[in-house]
């Protein structure tokens, strides 16, 4: 019995000694912490990657076929295929140009702050293992590519039915490379308008493209419309309101990826962006319908989806 008691005392002393040594040297046992963090980061990267893959598909879905159907339903019947062709060709051309030069101009490591240079042209230095934050570089490239596709496609509504197909290709190419991509670099790519730029630590806050996408496309569309002048048949009603509604519905759903994906993470911020997007769209549609009811005596399908 005495021997057993002495063994228990020795074991207890060893445990206490081990605890004291652990407490004394825990600051030097840093190899334990990275192990835990690495597991958490791997899980987070997997969740973020899966969500942004879905968001990338949703944003592309906005152009093909969402925007095509929306604009196609608004024009005269004889120009529907022309609108489809414009949007489809823009998607193809912008994808190639973004791969070749656009991504590098927007997110390259340029030192001037005005453009990113050509260091990442043709995805130089980008492979399946390189990361951009918590995402694979190539996925971030693909997600931003869908933005570069839909932005010039938004301008189609300003010149549809009034310009040639070759002009669409030339204008969209030059506008994306010379206007859109540099502005992306200014705000999102660490350029002159980002944090630490000419505005100091404040920088320009553009969560999901209010400036980069919508304002740039809106100004370009306004300038083109002003140059072309009023339409001859501007009072002609849309030939297919059903197309307009289907296209607008696709845009509505696609915007969950557009806004929610701009969080670049699968977290509460993305969920909040999706919820706000949905409530805003619903409220805007009801508001527009109420305005049409007040002004014209009845609401219309095109007016409701336009809202």
Model regions and ranges:
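Hydrophobic alpha-helical transmembrane bundles of multi-pass membrane proteins
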Residues: 39-306
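Short, Lys/Arg-enriched N-terminal segments with co-localized hydrophobic residues
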Residues: 8-12, 17-43
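Zn2+-dependent metallopeptidase catalytic domains
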Residues: 5
């Amino acid at each position: 019995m005495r021997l057993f008691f002495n063994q228990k005392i020795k074991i207890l002393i060893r445990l206490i000694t081990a605890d004291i040594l652990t407490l004394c040297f825990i600051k030097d046992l840093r190899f334990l912490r990275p192990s835990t963090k690495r597991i958490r980061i791997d899980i987070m990267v997997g969740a973020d990657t899966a969500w942004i893959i879905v968001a990338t598909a949703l944003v592309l879905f906005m152009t093909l076929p969402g925007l095509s159907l929306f604009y196609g339903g608004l024009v005269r019947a004889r120009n529907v295929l022309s609108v489809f062709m414009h949007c489809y060709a823009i998607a193809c051309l912008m994808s190639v140009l973004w791969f070749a030069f656009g991504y590098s101009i927007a997110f390259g490591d340029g030192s001037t702050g005005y453009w990113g240079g050509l260091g990442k042209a043709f995805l130089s230095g980008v492979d399946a293992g390189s990361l951009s934050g918590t995402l694979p570089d190539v996925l971030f490239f693909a997600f931003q590519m869908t933005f570069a596709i839909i932005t010039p496609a938004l301008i189609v509504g300003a010149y549809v039915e009034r310009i040639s197909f070759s002009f669409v290709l030339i204008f969209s190419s030059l506008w994306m490379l010379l206007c859109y991509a540099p502005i992306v670099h200014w705000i999102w790519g660490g350029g002159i308008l980002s944090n630490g730029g000419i505005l100091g630590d404040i920088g320009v806050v553009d969560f999901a493209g209010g400036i980069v996408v919508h304002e740039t496309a809106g100004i370009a569309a306004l300038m083109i419309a002003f140059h072309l002048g009023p339409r001859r048949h501007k009072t002609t009603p849309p030939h297919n309101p059903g197309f307009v509604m289907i296209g607008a519905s696709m845009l509505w759903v696609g915007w969950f990826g557009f806004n929610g994906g701009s969080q670049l993470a699968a977290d509460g911020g993305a969920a909040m962006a999706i919820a706000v997007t949905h409530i805003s769209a619903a409220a805007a549609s009801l508001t527009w319908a109420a305005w049409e009811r007040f002004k014209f005596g009845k609401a219309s399908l095109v007016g409701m989806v336009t809202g």
